[in-house]
């Protein structure tokens, strides 16, 4: 009798994706982040669903409803902080996943990579709208500042902003539609993740060496299921430690003040995972230029496959490219730090230099270094 997992229409999809999938024998723990992102998404959808049962998307009651969740709902505080810190874990895994793709040349799988970039945009949009929902001071200011950026679009800008707001300022209509979008987007992300996986399984996984692993494959189960479970346990350990010991560490104290249009907080800043892009936005003294730089800071990922000039796929055997890669990582950490600082003397110039370095590394220095390495290796 043939095994049901290989014949049943539904089971055979699961079987070919997670059980009998031929995987390279040498993929390291950097390949764990795909499954961790899946776990993060499931955690976010489940906790979000339970939060939505108690949340009200009305400007008069939104802040109170979040307080009610934390005070009166059984384990509401736990659900709320799992959701808030789960978003941080989601972005940590995302950044590491993208960094892995850059380092090992996974971007050569064009369809998989482009859907990944689309997923990154979708997750960022979802996180931004989620931050608006508690209707604290920083929620309100963030919504106003970020939506206002669209007014930099020539001719249609101001009309577009009012259309998104549903009025002449960020108000009840804005909050209601943000809640609707915040609810639906994770399901779109889940569908996109399925397509992401579909395209990945067309080619098979990359591996640290960047060479073809067709001659040396092992089944996904039990080898990588066990390996992924270890990663998931570590993720849950870090997330629960964060939630139970310092749930507000990554948040902003201003968001515990109800939104007040008449009172502006001294420093408006987004959540930590947007600070690098926010620093790039602020480093350009022109509104339209800043908005373009902000979008390009993420969109630049889509053109990375076109900038691949090396004859080797991975950076594993390319020490000069490795140096530039880690310089890029350091630069992104610097930008994240600058994004959280006030706009005054030393920080402005540091932010501008870090922004220039960010684009220079990706668009100019890394492709040139790859060409140089080709010559050094007589390729």
Curated annotation (Swiss-Prot):
Q: Which membrane topology describes this protein?
A: Multi-pass membrane protein
Which spans are transmembrane here? Answer: 33-53, 77-98, 113-133, 178-198, 226-246, 288-308, 320-340, 347-367
One example of a Gene Ontology biological process annotation: mitochondrial electron transport, ubiquinol to cytochrome c
Textual note on the cofactor? Binds 2 heme b groups non-covalently.
Q: Which residues bind heme b b562?
A: 83, 182
Entry binding sites for heme b b566: 97, 196
Subcellular location per UniProt equals: Mitochondrion inner membrane
Q: Which PROSITE patterns match?
A: CYTB_CTER, CYTB_NTER
Q: What are the alphabetically sorted keywords of the record?
A: Electron transport, Heme, Iron, Membrane, Metal-binding, Mitochondrion, Mitochondrion inner membrane, Respiratory chain, Transmembrane, Transmembrane helix, Transport, Ubiquinone
> What is the required cofactor set for this protein?
heme b
- Coiled-coil segments: none
A GO molecular function assigned to this protein is: metal ion binding
Database matches in InterPro entries: Cyt_b/b6_C (IPR005798), Cyt_b/b6_C_sf (IPR036150), Cyt_b/b6_N (IPR005797), Cytb/b6-like_sf (IPR027387), Cytochrome_b (IPR030689), Cytochrome_b_C_euk/bac (IPR048260), Cytochrome_b_N_euk/bac (IPR048259), Di-haem_cyt_TM (IPR016174)
Residues that hold a ubiquinone according to the record: 201
Q: How is this protein annotated for GO cellular component?
A: mitochondrial inner membrane; respiratory chain complex III
Q: Subunit structure, per the record? A: The cytochrome bc1 complex contains 11 subunits: 3 respiratory subunits (MT-CYB, CYC1 and UQCRFS1), 2 core proteins (UQCRC1 and UQCRC2) and 6 low-molecular weight proteins (UQCRH/QCR6, UQCRB/QCR7, UQCRQ/QCR8, UQCR10/QCR9, UQCR11/QCR10 and a cleavage product of UQCRFS1). This cytochrome bc1 complex then forms a dimer.
Extra remark: Heme 1 (or BL or b562) is low-potential and absorbs at about 562 nm, and heme 2 (or BH or b566) is high-potential and absorbs at about 566 nm.
Entry function: Component of the ubiquinol-cytochrome c reductase complex (complex III or cytochrome b-c1 complex) that is part of the mitochondrial respiratory chain. The b-c1 complex mediates electron transfer from ubiquinol to cytochrome c. Contributes to the generation of a proton gradient across the mitochondrial membrane that is then used for ATP synthesis.
Family that this chain belongs to: Belongs to the cytochrome b family.
Protein name from the UniProt record? Cytochrome b
Organism of origin: Episoriculus macrurus
The upper taxonomy is: Eukaryota, Metazoa, Chordata, Craniata, Vertebrata
Name the gene that codes for it: MT-CYB
């Amino acid at each position: 009798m043939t095994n049901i997992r290989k014949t049943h229409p539904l089971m055979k999809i699961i079987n070919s994706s997670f059980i009998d999938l031929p995987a390279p024998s040498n993929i390291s723990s950097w390949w764990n982040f795909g499954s961790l992102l899946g776990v993060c998404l499931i955690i976010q959808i489940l906790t979000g669903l339970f939060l939505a049962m108690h949340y009200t998307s009305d400007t008069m009651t939104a802040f109170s409803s979040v307080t009610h969740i934390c005070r009166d709902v059984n384990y509401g505080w736990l659900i709320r902080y799992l959701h808030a810190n789960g978003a941080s874990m989601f972005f940590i895994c995302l950044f590491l996943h993208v960094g892995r793709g850059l380092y090992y040349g996974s971007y050569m799988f064009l369809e998989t990579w482009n859907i990944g970039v689309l997923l990154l945009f979708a997750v960022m949009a979802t996180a931004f709208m989620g931050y608006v929902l508690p209707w604290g001071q920083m929620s309100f200011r963030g919504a106003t500042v970020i939506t206002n950026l669209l007014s930099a679009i020539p001719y249609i800008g101001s009309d577009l902003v009012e259309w998104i707001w549903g009025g002449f300022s960020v108000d009840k209509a804005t909050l209601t539609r943000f809640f609707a979008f915040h609810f639906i987007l994770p399901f779109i992300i889940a569908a996109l993740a399925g397509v992401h996986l579909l395209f990945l399984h067309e080619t098979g996984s990359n591996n640290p060496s960047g060479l073809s692993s067709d001659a040396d494959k092992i089944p996904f189960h039990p080898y990588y299921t066990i390996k992924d479970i270890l990663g998931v346990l570590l993720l849950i350990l870090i997330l629960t430690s964060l939630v139970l010991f310092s749930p507000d560490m990554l948040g902003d104290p201003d968001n515990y003040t109800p939104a007040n249009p008449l009172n502006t907080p001294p420093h408006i800043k987004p959540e930590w995972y947007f600070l690098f892009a926010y620093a790039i936005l602020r480093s350009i003294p022109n509104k339209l230029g800043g908005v373009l730089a902000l979008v390009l800071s993420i969109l630049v990922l889509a053109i990375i496959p076109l900038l691949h000039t090396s004859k080797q796929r991975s950076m594993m055997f390319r020490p000069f490219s490795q140096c530039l890669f880690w310089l890029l990582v350091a630069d992104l950490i610097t930008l994240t730090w600058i994004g959280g600082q006030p706009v005054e003397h030393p920080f402005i110039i540091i932010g501008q230099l870090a922004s220039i370095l960010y684009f220079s590394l990706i668009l100019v220095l890394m492709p040139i270094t790859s060409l140089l390495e080709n010559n050094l290796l007589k390729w």
